[in-house]
């Protein structure tokens, strides 16, 4: 009787962490391999790319909700109703995929209006 890959994966999924570790050790011994990630065949590590697109997330309206709504409205061009809904739905993205400079400027404007902001 042949065991399918799905049956093997299901059996492993039901195992405890300690049982999985023991299984891996047994497989390493039986097949003469290691489960450690090797860097032998990989190219030299490249420098980490600097992030070029940022998201400005409104995490809270702060003490002055009206100022936060005005700041969101001026930054996004939304109508009053939409800007109010966005502020009340915090945490929510205000703008996504913008440059670092634009994200920092928007975060500064919103923070000055009393809103709580996060740049990701």
UniProtKB/Swiss-Prot annotation:
GO BP of this protein: translation
Protein's UniProt keywords contain Protein transport: no
Keywords: Ribonucleoprotein, Ribosomal protein
Gene3D superfamilies: 3.30.1390.10, Single helix bin
GO molecular function, one term: structural constituent of ribosome
Signal sequence interval, chain numbering: none
UniProt cross-references to HAMAP family, sorted A to Z: Ribosomal_bL12
Assembly mode: Homodimer. Part of the ribosomal stalk of the 50S ribosomal subunit. Forms a multimeric L10(L12)X complex, where L10 forms an elongated spine to which 2 to 4 L12 dimers bind in a sequential fashion. Binds GTP-bound translation factors.
Name this protein carries in UniProt: Large ribosomal subunit protein bL12
The species this protein was found in: Pseudoalteromonas translucida (strain TAC 125)
Chain's gene name: rplL
